Amino acid sequence: MDRTATASWEVMSRRGEQQQQLMMQAPASHNGGSGGGEPARSRWAPKPEQILILESIFNSGMVNPAKDETARIRRLLERFGAVRDANVFYWFQNRRSRSRRRARQLQQACGAALHQLPSAAAAAGAGGGGGYYHHHHQPSSSPFLMHGGGGGGVVTSTTAAPAVAASGHFLADEVDGGGDDDLFAISRQMGLMARHGGGDHHYGSYADSDATQLSYQPTGTIQVFINGVAYDVPSGGALDMAGTFGRDAMLVHSSGEVLPVDEHGVLINSLQMGECYYLVSKSI
């Protein structure tokens, strides 16, 4: 009897050890083997300053950055919060998908409008008399077209900026309504907000609807790109950042370098012709 009990206990012990080993190996096989699969990609919620930079880069034409460009963009975004190369890659991938979907929607809307033109023309002709059509051009505004108080210079736009880049509400109409492929919670309101107080700086915005004014470049100015939009800035001397954009704003070069200013809020170095800069807020 003792030998039988001992044998039964040994069999049960071995079975328990085998079950324990199987339980320990189950997570490894579930994740793709003993080597361990890649961790699940977590949802990244970029900050407003990071979205502003990403949208500016995308609107400037860089819609599919290479690996080295992705790393450079990631280093620029890290100034405002934690981010990985994978986050940047998937942001651009998702952004391209939304742009293509938006383009298809616009194409369908234009096609429907073209089909309605013949009937509209026939209705106008039936009304009698020569029809008169007046197109009122609504000038687009740019959130970064600002007038400085006191001795601050004036920064003016030299191109008819796209509605996406010129609107203070970046891509509010292109953000998905919570779909599965919308990886990021895109903010619907972007841009720096003017602060009120002792040193008020008004953020004004305007754009001349006259086409001749769009091609005019004042003497003594250079053209730079701020947030993907071309602007004329004074070529001589440094730009008064505090007087033009407010003390809460700073300029970041496309290389990731923050442009230094003195105690009066004036750039120590002048802006360079044709260079790309990003206007962001110091407060995160």
Curated annotation (Swiss-Prot):
| Compartmental location | Nucleus
Disulfide pairings: none
Report the family membership. Belongs to the WUS homeobox family.
Its gene is: WOX10
Please report the name of this protein according to its UniProt entry.
WUSCHEL-related homeobox 10
Task: Write out the function statement from the record.
Answer: Transcription factor which may be involved in developmental processes.
GO cellular component terms? nucleus
List the PANTHER family hit by this protein, alphabetically.
WUSCHEL-RELATED HOMEOBOX 10 (PTHR46998:SF1), WUSCHEL-RELATED HOMEOBOX 11 (PTHR46998)
Q: Which UniProt keywords apply?
A: Developmental protein, DNA-binding, Homeobox, Nucleus, Transcription, Transcription regulation
Single GO MF descriptor: DNA binding
Q: Which domain of life is it from?
A: Eukaryota
Q: What GO biological process terms does the UniProt entry carry, in alphabetical order? A: adventitious root development
Does the entry feature the keyword Transcription, yes or no? yes
Q: Organism source for this protein?
A: Oryza sativa subsp. indica
The record's Pfam families line, in alphabetical order, gives: Homeodomain (PF00046)
Matching entries from InterPro entries are given as: HD (IPR001356), Homeodomain-like_sf (IPR009057), WOX11-like (IPR044558)
Q: Which residues bind DNA?
A: 39-103
Q: What is its main location?
A: nucleus
Q: Where is this region: Disordered?
A: 1-43
